[in-house]
UniProtKB/Swiss-Prot annotation:
It is a multi-pass membrane protein. The lineage of its organism: Bacteria, Bacillati, Mycoplasmatota, Mycoplasmoidales, Mycoplasmoidaceae. This is PTS system glucose-specific EIICBA component. One of its GO terms (biological process) is phosphoenolpyruvate-dependent sugar phosphotransferase system. Residues 1-284, 479-630 form the PTS EIIC type-1 domain. InterPro entries: Dup_hybrid_motif, Glu_permease_IIB, PTrfase_EIIB_Cys, PTS_EIIA_1_perm, PTS_EIIC, PTS_EIIC_1, PTS_Glucose_EIICBA, PTS_IIB_1. Keywords: Cell membrane, Kinase, Membrane, Phosphotransferase system, Sugar transport, Transferase, Transmembrane, Transmembrane helix, Transport. The active site is at 683 (phosphocysteine intermediate), 847 (tele-phosphohistidine intermediate). It comes from Mycoplasma pneumoniae (strain ATCC 29342 / M129 / Subtype 1). One of its GO terms (cellular component) is plasma membrane.
Length: 940
């Protein structure tokens, strides 16, 4: 018995240790994926603004580049272009702010603190980054060519590792720096936003302390980055170069691999975090080298011959040798420093052979000679020299595309996207080919033989070195602009719609109309906007193998074919028809060789695979796609049932809540109640919810609200695909959790609605309109006497320029919110004299007294106010009826100002509602109905 007891004890001990080990192993299980998902969500905030910025960048450049002698038109184009430029130039800052806000529960002060952090960090770093020249001497002027930088103990940091931000020379941390700053800011915010400091410095307590601590922490972060980031930057550049060579010499293998991984990450919502480094950093390629003053067009003048312009030269067809010959471009002299090129070929060659000559020795000089001088410098300042997509946009707006070089055989070479793409075949036209002065002798320009003779003669006397053809390469052999994004166009514009047609035709004939209404809209969304999730999730949950084994593979093939066949079609957001026109068709219309014609060719090829493959697999495996399985409950059907319930008189008090609030409440119940919610998040199409107890989650109500699918990526992390409604639901659910909406009352409405009896057997309406409140009652905000607006000594209110309503002469200074619970303080003027409230979408203004804006006009932020003691905050919602808004010292106010208080419904709210007075004269008590708004359509 004793032995058994010991064995039992050992077993218990072993079991206990095993449990501890298992808990330790699983302590962070899934947390990293959740973090990456949240990061991906944050990245989408700045990415969302890139389409409009890209449009301005492209359109502005098109106007400026074709303005000719019309100075006004040119400046108008630059005006538009620069607006787009500045967004891309400050992309790292935007990422920092977005990440900080995302990880801090949408706290605005976190975004402000992130900007302080970013600015301070780069300011600290700039003082320790010192440029040096070829001799290794520190440069103190702006004209000496920069050979590199000294950063702390690192004595030779390459130029591409340094960038310009906020006008400061700093490390090229790009979006990685923004993510680092945003993440650190969110950590500091969560730790210090509620800090209480001693009373003597109490002003700096709470959220005011967050930007202060961010400023201080920026010091060690700056020093750490100065120590390690140059090596990281060099590593990223090497990755970009390596991936680029894999594309150029590996037959597009990089884009094939990228395409599959990018699609495969869609269900987890982390694909944004995957592609962002390749789109926006040097990991996706770099133009830094060819615009750096140290990269000479002539190889023996510099360390590397990897970045030689392949069109700047002459080929001897007899021995396959080539000479580098500089010359004037587009009628300009061939010197960036004012030296005039010789008018004859021999003079040009002689000038070039002198190492002291500056006549188009570098790519930067070449580009400056072809464009408005400094355009590539501007690209560098705006951060458009790194990242596959940013480079494409930079070139598109640089002014270099479309410029022409006069070749010695009489032909003209036009610089296009192909000049900078490693998929461009390395081939030279037969005969001589060189850049020459436009005023060179016509005998030489049009006579390759004479050119060869002159060159050979010059070679004999000046010892000109010959280079074999294969030593001269494309502009950047490791770069292909837009290679990590353009592959989306064929499968989004053609492949997915073809799969959609297959789904519709695979449904029984009597249900094809139903299938078309669901699948057709999702496929059209993919075509028009490039948002594919609504379609992809219709079959992802039914047959994951169809997604990963067919769709993701074909997407990868799309990327691969676009790359190896030589397309360079840009985009800012996704592979939509809109982006195709703006960044494919329009550049091709300007003959910039984006080769957008490949999109329909490859797209039709993929469609021919998508359609039969999806049709056969759906039929063969009897997949329950729309129209084939149980009837899908759409959002329209759900709203119709609610309308029927209301017709039976069941919905009762539903008018107190908006439709979005009701649906958000249903979602909260489906996720186990608001107490079960740990964290909420949303991207463009997906609602992300982390819960405490996953057993409480019910997926059916979520699907009934229109979710294309619900996926659990970790035991407690759920993703529901709602399309563009995801962010709306997230905000509404957040409001309920934070107490901005009466949860108990909302639950009663939801539970009552769900008790709705079966609708009568009558013909249902053809179209069910969203539930709109027929009447909204506005309550008096204060005790007092009602007056007409005509009696207000202010023409703005008297003439009803702001809106319609009444005036109140207050009898006390206790001002309340003019409605039941849920009134939002849309705007609270800093001086305390005026407020705008939002009552179920109706905007109501309360202006206490006349000219009272003067009372606190000279007060600085943080100083105590006179007369007004504000009890609400901008953006807050009331939790009960007639909640206190502001306490007013009415006696003090009345000494200098007229206390009559205009209370009006603003004009914007009167477009769909008619104001009906309930009380117009006499005494009124706070909380009593003062007027109501009647929905105009309900009167028809």
């Amino acid at each position: 018995m004793q032995i058994k007891a010991q064995d039992t004890g050992q077993q218990k001990k072993s079991c206990l240790l095993s449990n501890i080990r298992n808990k330790w192993k699983n302590r962070n299980r899934g947390s990293f994926r959740q973090w990456v998902g949240k990061l991906s969500n944050g990245l989408m905030i700045p990415i969302a603004v890139l389409p409009i910025a890209g449009i301005f960048l492209g359109v502005g450049d098109a106007i400026a580049g074709n303005a000719g002698d019309l100075t006004g038109l040119r400046y108008f184009g630059l005006f538009i272009k620069n607006g787009g430029d500045v967004v891309f130039a400050n992309l790292p800052i935007l990422f920092a702010i977005a990440i900080a806000i995302t990880f801090s529960q949408d706290a605005g002060v976190a975004g402000f603190s992130a900007f302080v952090f970013w600015a301070a960090m780069n300011g600290f770093m700039s003082s320790l980054i010192l440029p040096f020249d070829k001799a290794g001497k520190i440069i103190t002027d702006t004209s000496t060519p920069i050979a590199g930088f000294k950063v702390l103990y690192n004595k030779s940091v390459p130029v591409h590792a340094i960038a310009t931000t906020l006008g400061l020379r700093t490390l090229s941390t790009s979006v990685f720096g923004g993510i680092i700053v945003g993440a650190l800011t969110s950590v500091l915010y969560k730790k210090f936003y509620a800090i209480r400091l001693p009373d003597v410095i109490g002003f700096f307590s709470g959220t005011r302390f967050v930007p202060i601590i961010c400023f201080v922490v920026a010091i060690p972060v700056a020093l750490i980055l100065l120590m390690i980031w140059p090596a990281v930057s060099i590593g990223l550049n090497a990755i970009g170069t390596g991936l680029g060579f894999l594309g150029g010499k590996g037959y597009g293998a990089n884009s094939l691999i990228f395409g599959y991984i990018e699609r495969s990450l869609i269900p987890f919502g982390v694909h944004h975090a995957f592609y962002a480094p390749l789109w926006y950093t040097s990991a996706g390629g770099s133009l830094q080298e060819i615009v750096n003053q140290q990269v000479w067009i002539r190889p023996d003048f510099h360390l590397s011959d990897n970045y030689v312009a392949r069109v700047i030269g002459w080929v001897d067809p007899n021995n396959s040798s080539m000479y580098i010959i500089p010359g004037a471009l587009n009628g300009q002299n061939g010197s960036s420093t004012g030296n005039t090129m010789s008018k004859d070929l021999n003079g040009a060659l002689s000038a070039y052979m002198s190492k002291e000559s500056t006549a188009f020795l570098t790519w930067k000089d070449l580009v400056d000679g072809l464009t408005f001088k400094g355009n590539f410098d501007k690209m560098a300042e705006n951060g458009l020299l790194d990242g596959s997509n940013k480079i494409w946009l930079g070139l598109n707006g640089s002014g270099i595309l479309g410029k022409k070089l006069l070749l010695s055989d009489g032909n003209v070479y036009t610089i296009t996207f192909k000049t900078f793409a490693n998929t461009t075949p390395i081939a030279w036209s037969k005969g001589a080919q060189a850049v020459l002065p436009l005023n060179a002798s016509s005998t030489i320009v049009n006579n390759p033989t004479a050119l060869a003779a002159a060159t050979q003669s010059n070679n004999n006397t000046n010892n000109i070195k010959l280079y074999p053809v294969n030593s001269f390469r494309v502009a950047v052999e490791s770069l292909n602009p837009a290679q990590y994004s353009q592959g989306k166009f064929p499968f989004m514009l053609f492949g997915i719609p073809a799969a959609g047609v297959a789904m519709i035709l695979a449904a029984p004939k009597d249900r094809r109309k139903e299938a078309a209404s669901i699948v057709g809209s999702a496929a059209f969304t993919s075509f028009l906007t490039g948002i594919t999730e609504p379609f992809e999730f219709t079959f992802l949950f039914l047959a994951p193998w169809l997604f990963y084994g067919v769709h993701a593979v074909l997407a990868a093939v799309s990327f691969w074919l676009m790359n190896i066949l030589g397309a360079n079609v840009g985009q800012t957001f996704s592979g939509s028809f809109i982006d195709f026109i703006l960044y494919g068709a329009l550049p091709d219309g300007r003959r910039w060789l984006a080769n957008s014609y490949l999109v329909p060719i490859i797209g039709l090829f993929l469609a021919a695979i998508y359609f039969p493959t999806f049709y056969f697999l759906i039929k063969h495996f009897n997949l329950a796609t729309p129209g084939r399985g149980g009837k899908l409950i759409t959002k329209k059907e759900y709203l119709a049932s609610k309308a029927a319930a209301k017709a039976e008189g069941v919905s009762g008090v539903a008018e107190n809540f908006t439709q979005t609030q009701i649906e958000a409440g249903i979602l909260l119940q489906a996720y186990g109640g608001k107490e079960n919610i740990v964290e909420l998040g949303a991207c463009i199409t997906k609602l992300r919810v982390t819960v405490k107890n996953p057993e409480l989650v019910k997926e059916e109500p979520i699907k009934e609200l229109g979710a294309a699918g619900v996926m659990r990526t970790t035991p407690t992390f759920f993703v529901a695909v709602f399309g563009t409604r995801a962010a709306v639901y997230k905000s509404a659910m957040q409001d309920i959790i934070q107490g901005k909406v009466n949860w108990e009352a909302l639950q009663k409405v939801i539970n009552t609605d769900q008790l709705a009896v079966e609708p009568k057997e009558t013909t249902p309406p053809k179209e069910v309109m969203p539930v709109v409140q027929d009447e909204i009652v506005i309550l008096s905000p204060v005790n007092g006497t009602l007056k007409s607006l005509n009696q207000v000594p202010d023409e703005t209110f008297k003439q009803k320029l702001v809106g319609e309503g009444v005036a109140i002469v207050p009898s006390d200074g206790h001002f309340k919110a003019p409605g039941e619970a849920g009134v939002k303080t849309e705007l609270a003027f800093p001086g305390g004299h005026a407020y705008i409230f939002d009552i179920d979408g109706i905007k109501v203004m309360l202006h206490i007294g006349i000219d009272t804006v003067q009372i606190n006009a000279k007060k600085q932020p943080g100083e105590p106010l006179e007369v007004f003691d504000i009890k609400t905050k901008q953006g807050e919602y009331t939790k009960e009826k007639s909640e206190s808004v502001v306490e007013v010292d009415l006696k003090k106010l009345s000494k200098k100002y007229n206390p009559i208080t205009p209370f009006v419904v603003m004009k914007e709210s009167l477009e769909n509602f008619k104001l009906v007075p309930i009380r117009q004269r006499g005494e009124i008590k706070v909380g009593q109905p003062i007027f109501k708004l009647v929905y105009k359509k309900s009167q028809a």
